[in-house]
Every structure is written in structure tokens, then in C-alpha cells.
Design a protein with these regions (language model features):
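Rossmann-like NAD(P)H-binding beta-loop-alpha module
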Residues: 164-210, 214
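N-terminal Rossmann-like dinucleotide-binding module
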Residues: 13-80, 159-162, 172, 254
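Short amphipathic alpha-helix with an adjacent loop that forms part of the alpha/beta core around
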Residues: 91-98
Length: 474
């Protein structure tokens, strides 16, 4: 039954009992129905998992599903055959805005802000998959709007709700590893093609796909099977590469532990692809096969902190304290935090936090829990959002925190794009280009408050993007 009809029928049935949308009463009030009315955007793939997580709370009613690709959306449509379906998010806004309490956005990275912001401006709560946005400007804007409108927000980096993330913070604050000076993070991604040429062939658009809507704010181009499904992550116009995919999961621990602000410096190096003898490929529209990124933070308590990121098969050196046969991280990646008294390591999603050398775990007595645990831990991340919307509970990854984390991830990508950029001098060809004399291959100095690179102006073009006409941010 559609919610509008339900409200009408309920009002007619009883004047003593009514169902009131939670946004009418405010986020600190529980509606009599204790139900959150959600519109979901991007319901295939990861979106299907989030939808099932929302449904499992028993406190969510889906007002509508919106997806541009019926093939990817089919499993969700089959599970919820009675939920109204859309392809264009703007029609959801026009037709169902008043019936919605919250939105869930799990579309490709380049459309997160485009879809979420209009609803956020109307005080709709927002659950948005990681990374929060496609570029730094969007992340800052999402953070500001969330604060201005006083809405409940959550980014989909579920490790933020884990017990281990809180345990790690309590350990560090107890002083057991001293002042942190270096952090190493790594992932096994990409597990999709990167370092590839821009597709030029025009393939047939699948009848179930609205290609124009899928492109959204990105420039129009011919459809090619190289983009879908999932492989869009490896193209800068749509995705954010290995770092964008996993950085918000793996960097979650140091961000939670240290409450990091904006980085002040960023520097990158990437795998080189060669297309001829001594001729480096210009695949700058594609994220590189692998990269190493160095970020610097200034921290009031710990001093200067270096955060190093590795992807595409690259990994940091093993800690000296590691015994022969001991491993670090898991198959997806991990984090090492070096202090002047010891070392803390954890797996992907902040799991399995532990101290090195390993005998420290036997000798150390953990402090009493200081930070509230989320019921269900990492598995309770989605329910934590619902609880925030209905009961005013604090969410683990609100946009104030998630925005800064996303900006840091995207700052690393900005350094990668600067490294990839080939600035040819007039009259020169790719064979004349000297990679060791490239102005983008430098340490970039970042003014976080003003969102500006101060020593390489070209890189400021990647702080935002060119939006296709008609798709500008609302």
C-alpha cells in the first residue's frame, strides 16, 4: 500500500492514533509508528545489501526504488515487488518528496552528491555509500548542508561501527604506543581494470539501461561495455579508483583514533604503462594499476604524522617487531600505526586490532570502555543510522567525520592525477616528454580550509569537476 493511501486510511480509521513521518516531529522525536520511510537510489549490487540491512531492522518502509539499470536492480525488485520503481531520481523528488524521511544512495561515485543533495536540502536524512562523494568540493558541500539542515547522516563505511575501532582509540589514548608518527595503510584493490586506454568503440546500449541517466553529471560519450558493471571504478570520470573504493574503510581506524583534520601535504607515485620503446602511455582518464601515496597531517597532540597508502599489489615494509611467520592485515588490506613506544595493527574494516610486539597483548591491561559500542558492531552500522533517524542516536560515520575522511581519500587521488598529468611543451610529442621534469610530480601543498593547492595551480581543476549542462549540483 502506498504511504499516502495508508495515511489517509489510518486517519479515517482512528482519530486517536496516527502515523506521522519522523521528519515532521524532528530527529529527536520518535514518530508513533516508529517507522522510517526511505527512498533508495542505486538498488543493485551494494545497494541491494544496504536495502536488506535496512529491511532487517524491521523499522523501515521503502517508499520507492530508483535505478537506471533494470538488470542490476532485478534482484531487489524481485524481493520487494510492491515498491514503486523509478529510473530518474528527479521524478522521485517531484512526486514523493513529502512521503520520504530519508534517502539511501548507493549509485556510482560520480552521482552520490547529485542525487543526495536535493533531498538533504529538504531535511531528509541521508545514508550514502563510500566514498561520500566523487570530488573534494562535493564532500565539503555535503558536510555543510548536513550541518545546516540538522539531519542524521551516515556514510557506508561499516568499520566505523566496529568495537575494534573504539578499542584501538582507547588503547592509543591510554598511551600504550606513545605518540604516533607514521601510519601505513594498504589494500589488495583494484580487482577491476585500471591503467587502461579510454574506450573508443561504440557498443550497443542494453535495453534495460538508461545511459544518459547513468552518465548524470559526466560528459556525454558513447556507451561501451568496458564501463559496466563495476568497472567504472577504474575511470576518473565515474570512479575514484582503489583508494576511493577502500580508503574510507581502511583509513577509518586512524581517523577515529586521532580525529584527523585536513592533510597539509600530498605526494604520489604510480605504476608506469609503456606503449612503445621509451614512450609512456597517456592513460590519464584511467586510475593507475597501482600507486603509493604520502599524506602529512599536523596533530596537536602527536605532532606531524605521515600517512602512507599502498594499492595494486604494493604493501608497506613489515614492522620490525613482527616475528617470523606472523602476518599483518588480511586478504583485503590493513593498517599499521607506529608510535614511539609501540605499534598497533588491524585488518580491513578496523577488525582484529592488536599490539606489537605480540607479547604486549599479554602484558597490557585494556582500559575500561570509554566510547559507547554500537549494538551489533560492524553489522549494526545500518541499524545505527535508522536508530539515529528515529531516536536521535549518534551515528558512527556522520558527514562531519565522513566528509573529512572522504576529502583525505580524494586528496590522495588528486596527487595521483597530478602525477599522471602530462604537460607537454609547445611543439613536443609524447616521445619528447620527460617524466622527471613533470610539474605535477611533486609534493602538493594543501590549504584545507580554502580547498586549494598552493604550489601547482593545475591540480585545483580536480578539486571539483565540470558538470554536464543540466546536471549542476542543486
Amino acid at each position: 500500500m502506498q504511504r499516502r493511501k495508508f495515511l489517509k486510511n489510518a486517519a479515517a480509521a482512528s482519530a486517536a492514533f496516527s502515523i506521522v513521518p519522523s521528519h515532521v516531529l524532528g530527529k529527536m522525536h520518535v514518530p508513533p509508528s516508529d517507522t522510517l520511510y526511505v527512498a533508495a537510489f542505486g538498488v543493485g549490487g551494494r545497494g541491494n545489501g544496504v536495502i536488506q540491512g535496512l529491511n532487517a531492522t524491521g523499522r523501515v518502509k521503502f517508499v520507492s526504488f530508483c535505478d537506471v539499470d533494470d538488470r542490476r536492480a532485478k534482484p531487489t525488485y524481485d524481493l520487494f515487488p510492491n515498491v514503486k520503481r523509478y529510473k530518474d531520481f528527479r521524478k522521485v523528488y517531484d512526486e514523493q518528496l513529502k512521503d520520504i524521511d530519508a534517502v539511501m544512495v548507493a549509485t556510482p561515485d560520480h552521482t552520490h552528491a547529485t542525487i543526495a543533495l536535493p533531498f538533504m536540502r529538504e531535511k531528509k536524512h541521508a545514508y550514502v555509500e563510500k566514498p561520500l562523494t566523487h570530488n573534494i568540493h562535493e564532500a565539503r558541500l555535503m558536510t555543510q548542508v548536513a550541518k545546516e539542515k540538522g539531519i542524521v547522516t551516515q556514510m557506508g563505511n561499516q568499520g566505523a561501527s566496529s568495537d575494534d575501532s573504539r578499542i584501538a582509540r582507547e588503547w592509543v589514548e591510554s598511551g600504550v604506543i606513545g605518540k604516533i608518527h607514521t601510519i601505513d595503510c594498504w589494500t589488495n584493490r583494484p580487482v577491476w581494470p585500471q591503467g587502461v586506454p579510454t574506450p573508443t568503440q561504440k557498443d550497443r546500449i542494453p535495453k534495460e539501461l538508461d545511459w544518459d541517466l547513468w552518465l548524470g553529471p559526466a560528459a556525454m560519450r558513447d556507451y561501451n561495455d568496458a564501463y559496466l558493471p563495476f568497472k567504472w571504478r577504474g575511470f576518473w570520470d565515474f570512479g575514484t579508483g582503489a583508494l576511493g573504493d577502500m580508503g574510507c574503510h581502511i583509513m577509518e581506524t586512524p581517523f577515529s583514533v586521532l580525529d584527523l583534520g585536513y592533510p597539509t601535504e600530498a605526494e604520489a607515485s604510480c605504476t608506469t604503462v609503456w606503449v612503445d620503446d621509451f614512450v609512456e602511455a597517456d592513460y590519464s582518464h584511467s586510475c593507475p594499476p597501482s600507486s603509493k601515496i604520502h599524506l602529512k597531517f599536523e596533530h596537536e597532540e602527536h605532532g606531524d604524522i605521515a600517512l602512507n597508502w599502498y594499492d595494486g599489489g604494493l604493501k608497506p615494509d613489515l614492522p620490525d617487531e613482527l616475528k617470523d611467520g606472523e602476518t599483518i592485515g588480511d586478504t583485503g588490506g590493513g593498517t599499521i600505526m607506529y608510535g614511539d613506544k609501540g605499534t598497533l595493527i588491524c585488518d580491513t574494516y578496523s577488525r582484529n586490532a592488536r599490539l606489537l610486539p605480540s607479547n604486549m597483548m599479554d602484558l597490557y591491561k585494556s582500559p575500561a570502555p570509554k566510547y559507547p559500542r554500537i549494538p551489533g558492531g560492524m553489522d549494526g552500522h545500518i541499524a545505527n543510522f535508522v536508530d539515529g533517524c528515529l531516536n536521535g542516536a549518534a551515528t558512527s560515520s556522520n558527514f562531519d567525520k565522513a566528509g573529512r575522511l572522504t576529502e583525505t581519500v580524494l586528496m590522495g587521488n588528486l596527487a595521483v592525477q597530478a602525477y599522471q598529468y602530462k604537460e607537454l611543451k609547445p611543439g613536443k610529442t609524447a616521445r619528447d616528454w620527460d617524466p622527471y621534469d613533470s610539474p605535477g610530480r611533486r609534493k602538493l601543498l594543501w590549504d584545507g580550509e580554502n580547498m586549494k593547492i598552493t604550489n601547482y595551480d593545475k591540480a585545483n581543476e580536480w578539486v571539483t569537476r565540470d558538470y554536464r549542462e543540466g546536471w549542476e549540483l542543486k
